[in-house]
Amino acid sequence: MFLCFCPCHVPIMSRLSPATGISSRLRFSIGLSSDGRLIPFGFRFRRNDVPFKRRLRFVIRAQLSEAFSPDLGLDSQAVKSRDTSNLPWIGPVPGDIAEVEAYCRIFRSAERLHGALMETLCNPVTGECRVPYDFSPEEKPLLEDKIVSVLGCILSLLNKGRKEILSGRSSSMNSFNLDDVGVAEESLPPLAVFRGEMKRCCESLHIALENYLTPDDERSGIVWRKLQKLKNVCYDAGFPRSDNYPCQTLFANWDPIYSSNTKEDIDSYESEIAFWRGGQVTQEGLKWLIENGFKTIVDLRAEIVKDTFYQTALDDAISLGKITVVQIPIDVRMAPKAEQVELFASIVSDSSKRPIYVHSKEGVWRTSAMVSRWKQYMTRPITKEIPVSEESKRREVSETKLGSNAVVSGKGVPDEQTDKVSEINEVDSRSASSQSKESGRFEGDTSASEFNMVSDPLKSQVPPGNIFSRKEMSKFLKSKSIAPAGYLTNPSKILGTVPTPQFSYTGVTNGNQIVDKDSIRRLAETGNSNGTLLPTSSQSLDFGNGKFSNGNVHASDNTNKSISDNRGNGFSAAPIAVPPSDNLSRAVGSHSVRESQTQRNNSGSSSDSSDDEAGAIEGNMCASATGVVRVQSRKKAEMFLVRTDGVSCTREKVTESSLAFTHPSTQQQMLLWKTTPKTVLLLKKLGQELMEEAKEAASFLYHQENMNVLVEPEVHDVFARIPGFGFVQTFYIQDTSDLHERVDFVACLGGDGVILHASNLFKGAVPPVVSFNLGSLGFLTSHPFEDFRQDLKRVIHGNNTLDGVYITLRMRLRCEIYRKGKAMPGKVFDVLNEIVVDRGSNPYLSKIECYEHDRLITKVQGDGVIVATPTGSTAYSTAAGGSMVHPNVPCMLFTPICPHSLSFRPVILPDSAKLELKIPDDARSNAWVSFDGKRRQQLSRGDSVRIYMSQHPLPTVNKSDQTGDWFRSLIRCLNWNERLDQKAL
């Protein structure tokens, strides 16, 4: 029935009485091996490559005789029924033989994972340790702690599970009731609780190893595949399967879903299988699906699960056309939305995409919800349109001249208004025919009834997020009513916007005046020249035989101006005669002027309005976020300005169609402490130099400023031998991952090399750095050491001064080395000055392909190429002919080194560029790469370096300000533009 390699069973053999054989009631088998062969019931071991299992049959006989009663009904155990009403996530009930099998599958998979890990760590035969230590030293202990803790937890759970399965839990078997099952762990059967704990451990181990196991390493692949198999058997509920189904280590909760919903058709075994459902797909699972002819995989997971092995195999399969993947993201424990169910139904109904496999993480919650909603969608009732006579159609069309059909067809009303039409008419309909017409369907169309479902009942009761916005509150206060917005939404108050189709204009009066409906309403409220008051209860005003023009109505000089009352329900009230009067034009004109003046006065708040309310008005003053105000012309096209940095995107409406800058892209940055800093890292030049200056600075910081002083371990050894400096602390140089969390700012004593060392010391965020010039050049060190007390006080107490402390955020470059298209572990560097790829000692010119966002831009043939930051522009790049760039400019410099082509000039790229320097396969020789002049290593053919802006800059404290310090360094260190003055004539 099952195999078990659990070592805990071996010492039990000596304590059990032998038996003559296995009961005939247990003589059946189910294929559980990975190669598809049927394995007989019993335990199997291998000794010297010779299988033996007769002695272990005695163990099973003795255990089953003690743990289980003879009337368990093992003869009736068969493959799990296809009835999905049996709560598949619970698993088999306690005492079932399927429960024992599920336990042993987990034991066996865990044993294999443990063996693969131990063999990878250290070969038991040769004693060779084969673990690559390419990752950084500070990450090594964290990884070891995670793996050891997770393995210890798994071992503890396995021992507990073995004891439970071997002791034969008769009490839990008798007390368990399926009706009492809930989500809480205390009400779940023991197997479900055990699987839940094992799942958490496996997922923790997955997260710990996902960044360190790469597909190009065979040993990593073995460990990863064993881990995924253990996860699958933990995800699986534990029911037995048919012989032709994949084993539980490949897919959890594998189950076919049939097209028919009736139990008689399903049990007939002739029913068509619509698709298969189950748990996550792994590398081996994908291989099985392809070999068995599956064409489509539907992934219901909304979360991101990092599995490089599976993703690599999936990309290859997709590129070869072997499989198609459809993403329908659904959150955990949530039901799919209506549009997602419709999309899924369309995929299932397409016979060219079958066979189909649908999966989530475990194949239980989201897949069950999708199957249920899919069946509900497929069995929904179909309604047909009620036939309407031609006469009634003409009557309705004449009554609603510009009804929803014309609007939906796109004649003058935008899509946003179309959505409102369908929503309003859908609520306001009274018959099937009017509903089909008002929702935008053309005559003669027949469709299924709207398929609507609430994916989350709680969220469906939550009002929209903008219900209390300025726009919505203004609409509500102006409406002076409490009725739903779908029935009594007031017309738009701003000229130039297309009114909602609920308020249609169907009348035309003589004349060439442009009349606004709000003006007519005000006239109706105040009365005409004869003193006749128009009714104010009408919710919309229709002008007979009128036509749209930019959201306004062109009126003509008919003797009687008819104003009809349209209630929005397809029926129009009798027109109201309005005698000719000059008050109409005067009222409209005066109202337009008053409204224009009001909008000019409130132009400051116009940016808070939505796009619909920001329409162009002839003769009106408009404003935008650019700060430029001018008169908008109706003939001028509107535009949007979209700003994106490759990560985020913002949209700014430019209503006056004029682009302008309101402020420079970079400004001066000032350092302000929310709380007083307490810890400082004191760095100095290597060797015994500058020890006196370091002692002086440390004493000042500790005794006068009451700060904790940290130094590097080598410097701490020197301080430890000096009396009176026991307050100096240190850190472990091998673990600097959390150093930035302990240090408030850094004080550097030396030259530019100390600042580069500080940049290399912090892998992520870097605290503010104040540097004192005690080196040979000191381009980046703008503070003289003579003023160190004053400068340090300004940094520590910068909040209490009026001028504050200015800092410069110096951009760094993140560099990653790739080999054969795969990232090399531990080969990630943050560069402050430059990265250099050169030919090294090779006699041939280097050939380097340069890509920007995966596009080949050029090929460098020369001694090499430099990619520098603005800070490094005054170093190696300047010597190679590059420009000198202010450190505040967000860019990167691309400078060739002695190029073979004289037309190859240096260029400056934006900081959003993503470069890749690749050594092509046809290059004559390899190349070398160095980062800030250190960590030099060889690049073979096919290797590449990817370069992009680092998230964390290096903040340096200025002596005066950014520009002043930079020009002083140019003059002091590089003698920039130093020459004799020209004599006067």
UniProtKB/Swiss-Prot annotation:
It catalyses: NAD(+) + ATP = ADP + NADP(+) + H(+). Residues 548-569 have a biased composition (Polar residues). The keyword Chloroplast applies. Expressed in leaves. Residues 335-380 are annotated as: Calmodulin-binding. Residues 389-466, 548-615 are annotated as: Disordered. GO terms for molecular function: ATP binding; calmodulin binding; NAD+ kinase activity. Involved in chlorophyll synthesis and chloroplast protection against oxidative damage. Keywords: ATP-binding, Calmodulin-binding, Chloroplast, Kinase, NAD, NADP, Nucleotide-binding, Plastid, Transferase, Transit peptide. GO terms for cellular component: chloroplast. The keyword Nucleotide-binding applies. Pfam families: NAD_kinase, NAD_kinase_C, PTP-NADK. This is NAD kinase 2, chloroplastic.
